[in-house]
Amino acid sequence: IGGWTGWSWNTNLIPEPTKLLQEIHDNGYKIALNLHPADGIDSIESPSYYKAMSRELEGKYGSDGKIAWYLDYPDFTKSFFDNVIRDHESEGVDFWWLDWQQHLTSPYTPGLGQTFWCNHVFYNDMVKNRPDRRPVIFHRWGGLGSHRYQIGFSGDALINFPTLAF
């Protein structure tokens, strides 16, 4: 796994993630985790999530130890949010910073803009499942109409003096 995806904590670096998130909240901050979801759910990196989703989805979206990313499909989406997102939110994650940059349109649903759909699904999940707070996500611009969902960011930037001088 190349470091751009994954759903579990590196406990060598963060041995007690829930405790860390609580300390951050105790200091008055909100917490967003940056997601690069395109590689799906890997059995090596995220074994508990992989097992739960694989059982629920009956192997439908993956083989060889990986569940592919199929946010277009309601059964995948429900299983993903129930098993992965709810778990992290129960640990203390307040909202999500999606960093989708793989496919402009879905390889499974013709004409469906992937960035727009990620914005729509994550935002509306928060509307439905976290009514105690104002829904918010960070994400890239997903095309016309997507401004209703996310606080946009322009993407990655080079961190050096020539870039600042521009």
What label would you give each PLM region?
Residues I1-F166:
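Catalytic-domain carbohydrate-binding cleft regions of carbohydrate-active enzymes
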